[in-house]
Regions:
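Phosphate- and other anionic-substrate recognition elements at nucleic-acid/protein interfaces
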Residues: 1-118
Length: 118
């Protein structure tokens, strides 16, 4: 995330939380083999997440890509296409964008973990 995007992300998340409410922020971690510029952007992203969570007194949960893919598609090294196909099949959707599929997969990963805790 470029430096200028962090305030925009903060504003969007703050507005969504104020409008719809939340108890937990859930996001996907990155793999360790990423390029330095990606790691820098990710660090800014996590900083925004932590600040928003602190301001709104929210819990934070983070899941690795392989875990999310395993929950979504049944295998930890699923391709983007496999995740999209699995999300559409499991939930009767017609998602075509991999970012949307990832968001749905992250949500369901969290919900599965939450159900296991109860």
């Amino acid at each position: 995330m470029p430096h200028g995007k962090a305030p925009q992300l903060f504003y969007i998340l703050d507005k969504l939380i104020n409008e719809y409410g939340a108890s937990t922020l859930v996001y996907e971690s990155i793999d360790f083999g990423v390029h330095k510029s990606q790691a820098d952007s990710y660090g800014r992203f996590v900083g925004v997440i932590e600040l928003i969570a602190f301001n709104h007194q929210l819990d934070i949960e983070c899941y690795g890509p392989k875990h999310i893919k395993r929950i979504a598609a049944g295998i930890g090294d699923a391709s983007k296409g496999q995740v999209i196909e699995s999300i559409n099949t499991k939930y009767g959707l017609s998602v075509t964008d991999d970012n949307e599929a990832d968001a749905i997969a992250i949500y369901h990963t969290y919900m599965e973990a939450l159900c296991r805790m109860k």
